[in-house]
């Protein structure tokens, strides 16, 4: 439950954003972290599909154009309350006030290539995602969108990396003070 202190709502539990290029392990990391910490896991892609928060389809990239305002309206109360782990491949449209930690997962391109081709990515979609990772687009987006001190970059190449990341983030959540 969120507390009010001099008109300012303070969360009892932190909110984290787990972001990165598709295939970097966001969903695996975020769901394992939610299980380890009893925080709520919110996959934006699933929410968009479930609530139909989209307007059209991008044939070239094979994805929906999401209605960002609908996503924000849907999640605002939960984010004010706190205790959420949000999983999404972008971060620039979320309000800065929502997050106490923004985690950008990074993966070597050879590993990412294998993961994405195993998912059936090809052509422009595969190429765009590999370039996005190579040029650190999501890391730059996070640094441009949030205070430097809350942005963390973690490597996510192996199962061991993911396990270590979950452990590190669990420790951070357990030590977090509102």
Curated annotation (Swiss-Prot):
Where is the region Disordered? 1-28
Q: Which InterPro entries match?
A: Adenyl_kinase_AK6, P-loop_NTPase
Broad class of where this protein is predominantly found: cytoplasm
Keywords assigned: ATP-binding, Cytoplasm, Kinase, Nucleotide-binding, Nucleus, Ribosome biogenesis, rRNA processing, Transferase
By its UniProt entry, which Pfam families does this protein fall under? Answer: AAA_18
Q: Which GO terms describe its molecular function?
A: adenylate kinase activity; ATP binding; ATP hydrolysis activity
The record's GO CC annotations read: cytoplasm; nucleus
Q: Which residues are ATP-binding?
A: 23, 25-28, 119
**Positions of region (LID):** 118-128
* Enzyme Commission number(s) from the entry: 2.7.4.3
Answer yes or no on keyword Cell inner membrane. no
Q: Where in the cell is it found?
A: Cytoplasm; Nucleus
Catalysis: reaction(s): AMP + ATP = 2 ADP; ATP + H2O = ADP + phosphate + H(+)
- Phenotype reported upon loss of the gene: Decreased stem growth.
GO aspect biological process, one term = unidimensional cell growth
Q: Does the keyword Glycosyltransferase apply?
A: no
Region NMPbind, residue ranges: 43-66
Top enzyme class: transferase
Its assembly, as annotated, is: Interacts with small ribosomal subunit protein uS11A/RPS14A. Not a structural component of 43S pre-ribosomes, but transiently interacts with them by binding to uS11.
Q: What does this protein do?
A: Broad-specificity nucleoside monophosphate (NMP) kinase that catalyzes the reversible transfer of the terminal phosphate group between nucleoside triphosphates and monophosphates. Also has ATPase activity. Involved in the late cytoplasmic maturation steps of the 40S ribosomal particles, specifically 18S rRNA maturation. While NMP activity is not required for ribosome maturation, ATPase activity is. Associates transiently with small ribosomal subunit protein uS11. ATP hydrolysis breaks the interaction with uS11.
The similarity comment for this entry is: Belongs to the adenylate kinase family. AK6 subfamily.
Q: Please give the name of this protein.
A: Adenylate kinase isoenzyme 6 homolog
Name the source organism: Arabidopsis thaliana
Originating gene: AAK6
